[in-house]
Amino acid sequence: RKIVGSSDVYKRQLLRHLLDRYGEDVLTWPIEVWNEPNLPGFWKDADKEEYLRLFAETLRAVKEVDSRFCVGGPAICGVQDVEWMQDFMTFCHDNALPLDFVTRHFYTFDTPEEDGHYSYGALRDPDESLKELQVSRDIVDSFPEYRGIPMHITEFNTSYRPDSPVHDTTRNAAYVARLLARLGEVNESYSYWTFGDVFEELGIPFTPFHGGFGLVANGCIPKPTFWTFAFFKQLQGECLLRSKEAVAVRRADGSVAGVAWNLGQETGGSSSLTFTLPTEGTWCALTKTVDENHANPLKVWHDLGEPSSLSSSLTKLLRESAAPAVKTCRLSAENGEVRLTLTLAQDSVVYFELTPVSGQSDRGYSYERAVKGE
């Protein structure tokens, strides 16, 4: 008790220092208290009562500096998460704490099996996994004074271990696409764990592709899941479609953009999707594909013999192999609509874009004559 109490002095000093140095922008920085206190590896004995006391004392110390600071927790993972979230919210209610937001972590991997330096396991059913988040949201909203406060997923990924090779695969990319289509339903934000593979929680990795958490392998080599996020970033506009297989939007300029995926554990093989857009005229269809043979540096590294260290030339090659396959074609409207059909390989992600073709060719220019040699 004395240790926690005395640490409040340092918390207040730190916040005042940050305010002095960076100004009131600091007030927009959410303050999350601790990390996974429901695990004994991060909080001694996973002692819930001690964590709740820490949370209350920290919240009060922060608010004493400036009541505009936003404070939240409990930053739990999926272990006994229902019990922890219920008890956390009850504690905040009973003590009339001015809780600003709620946080938790989200992983979707069965208990892994260790084999040498690596861990392997099955990805859970996405919809079943997402129910965990709805349960947390419902618990929060069952307290009238906290109903509707933001819920942030401050960590999410498939496996919760940084030695799970699934992280490096196109299967991971397709699975994460499936999650991204729904994670915004009950959460204010969701943060993928992590950006890069420079991570030493279990020691220094043995190989360039070792199942690290990151979107990017060491050496700035994008993994397939990097492109899932890059593709979703392009989806800004009016939502036209959101399903288990695709998301599409109409942009302000009239173009259409979307992401489609094929999660093999749900489809069992390749799949085909057809999108119909009511319109007239000629359109350009652009696709960027991530699958087993495109934007998959893991396969190239494997085919090269899985070298444990990379020369500069190999690193360059793997970066080059990490780019999606880009294709374009022209589509003409028939009967008042344009139809785009995508064939998706198992465990693939495809970005697609439909843009109206406008303008005329320069005088005398013929693409057909150029490519046919006439």
Summary of predicted features, one role per range:
Residues 1-5, 10:
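Single conserved hydrophobic/aromatic residue that forms the stacking wall/gate
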Residues 16-26, 91-98:
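Acidic (Asp/Glu)-rich catalytic clusters
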Residues 29-36, 154:
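Short, conserved phosphate-binding/catalytic loop or strand-edge motifs used
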Residues 48-182, 186-188, 207:
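Noncatalytic carbohydrate-binding groove/subsite architecture in carbohydrate-active enzymes
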Residues 152-271:
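Aromatic/acidic polysaccharide-binding cleft in carbohydrate-active enzymes
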Residues 243-303, 343-355, 361:
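Carbohydrate-binding surface patches
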Residues 279-340, 363:
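Acidic, Ser/Thr/Pro-rich beta/coil linker or hinge segments at domain junctions
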Residues 357-374:
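Terminal connector regions
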